[in-house]
Amino acid sequence: MFSKYLQSRVCGLHSFTNSSAQQLFSKSIAHSSRRNFVISSSCTKFRNVAIQRNAKREFSRCAALKNFSYHARCFHATRAVWEMTDPYKTLGVSKSASASEIKSAYYKLAKQYHPDANPDKAAQDKFVEIKQAYEVLQDPKKKKAFDTYGAGAFKNGEFTGGDFEGFQNGFAGASSFSSGFPGFNFEDLFGFSSRGPQARRNTSFDVFVGEDIEASITIDFMEAVRGAKKDLSYSVSSTCSSCHGSGLQPGSHKSTCFACKGTGQRLHFIPPSFHMQTTCDSCGGTGTTIPPNSACRSCMGSGTVRERKTVSIDIPPGIDDNTVLRVMGAGNDASTAKGGPNAKSRPGDLFATIHVRKHPFFVREGTNVTYNAKIPMTTAALGGTLRVPTLTGNVDLRVSPGTSTGDRITMAGKGIRKVNTSRYGNFYVNFEVTIPKILSPHERSLLEQLADALNDSTARRTQSSPSGTNSSTSTSSTSSKHSTGISTEPTTGEENKQDGSVGGFFKRAFRRLHPDEDQNPKKDESSS
């Protein structure tokens, strides 16, 4: 009666009589009474136009009580629901049939009902049914799902990908998105497994890869140049020797996961009508867990223990600072405690960062090495031989005359070897001319003579060497003064100005003849 009423509403036909609507409304009242709903007696009084409106409202309440909703569509019909048939009956095989028997039966029926061989419309529908049945039975997962849950594991002919045991027990192992996403891993939304970033899944067994370890080691400059072998100690997770990585005590067994009921999957609902299936985070998708009283006492059920490990690292010649070396299989061991009976594991890798100490006087630039050599100015001017250190020992270098600061000598092929090749860089010697800041009187005298010899008029001289005169002039004037008995005391600027006047000449002569008379001229003037 309810379906007839809906049909009449969808098609726009109002063929219900007052008596029919009254009967429907009476049934809804009786149903509401069984559900302990109180309906006012005044609602039983209705008339021609209100009959259908009240009946529709009461039927909506009845549908809500039965957890059922309907949608009236006037123009577009919903897609027909595909009712799945028994694939075993379709192919004519038993549930214990092998894969080869199922395949043989499929080829036999497909050849018989193929549209090219049988153009009948019924044969085409039969061929589609045969193909769908074979797709279910040839896939081990789909076959297992159908054997366990029947057609409920398929929606509109499509495999949902998970077990549906939770529907029989109040959606066990499922959680709602409206309740704070408990137990939901967002990585599964994008295709990542919740079993950890290092877990890789296979159709027949699980392979667990341990986490990688990062460490650092410091070496000397010459060890990086020549290569070395260094020992590195670090903390690592190793497989437990008591349980061999299973996490169980001897003779113990795993139990079914309580969160997912052994399915390894959890179902999450997205209102209004979407659902998502993710890997169970309690068991890691295996469907089994280790009971607390069965866990290994050495590793507490984890399958791994922490310990110190030492590995020997071969450092190749020519390695540079901050270079990372990879040691395969020297990382953490993977635990198989959450894996299945065929789970396998592989340790991670060790990534060692090499730090090179700086050298006191060698400067590295890639494979080239630079050494700054300091030479005195006499060697720079006259040339000579200089002993400098290199990567292979001391070497005597010839310094060309006139070498200045910034000049460079290149020793090709004497640098650092390029890693994993036979090529070497260059060794450069940069010259830096050093000049003394403090001079002895003898050194200053020699330099002044050198300045005179080079006609360097800008060099500063002491008082014994008048500026602006060369060595020959000073020598001749000195000899003439000694021959005449005249002192060689230096003269001031005022006296030089008076050299050309007669008064100046007699004044100087008087001072030389009567030195006592001129000791305190100011005093004589004051007394007079």
Swiss-Prot record:
Residues 86-150 form the J domain. GO terms for molecular function: ATP binding; Hsp70 protein binding; unfolded protein binding; zinc ion binding. Coiled coil: none annotated. It comes from the Eukaryota. CXXCXGXG motif repeats lie at residues 240-247, 257-264, 280-287, 296-303. Residues 455-528 are annotated as: Disordered. Keywords: Chaperone, Metal-binding, Mitochondrion, Repeat, Transit peptide, Zinc, Zinc-finger. HAMAP family: DnaJ. This is DnaJ homolog 1, mitochondrial. It comes from Schizosaccharomyces pombe (strain 972 / ATCC 24843) (Fission yeast). The gene is mdj1.
